[in-house]
Amino acid sequence: MANRCISLLMVLCLACLTGCDRSDDIESIFTGKVWHLAGFYQTTDWDNPNMSHPLQSDYNSHSDLSAYNITFFTDGTALIALPQGCQLTALWAADGNERHRTFSFSEWKTVSGDPARLGGHAKQMLDQLKRVSYYQGNSYYIQLFDDSKRYFMQFADLSKYN
């Protein structure tokens, strides 16, 4: 009887140790793909996708935004590519905890082009990337939110749709 109790306790302990982790797999979400800008959005409830709507914009289709992209690497760097040959790198960090899902960029460096000369969507994207504090998403899309969780940019992995 004592052996059964010990065995049962060991199985229960093992189940507790291998239980579900309520955090995101950061590398599988962000790395290994090129993320293309799909649009700029506003929301009243960041947990409810039905509460968001696109901000007015002068682009005609999502293909107009395909030149705006980010590639995240497992070493913690990101390459941001914008029109006019402008490329920047930054360090990125994400916490996949279900309650927080924090995200940040730091240590920006210009690789090519002149970010000061950017206008339109390129300037808007770069300005918003520098204010990103939170994220939501999966391996198909990511949303990068500002500190208020009211404005976000959505990016898509277009290879998933080809």
Regions found by a protein language model. Give the residues of each.
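Lipid interaction determinants
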Residues: 20-91, 95-162
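Sec-dependent bacterial lipoprotein signal peptides
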Residues: 1-18
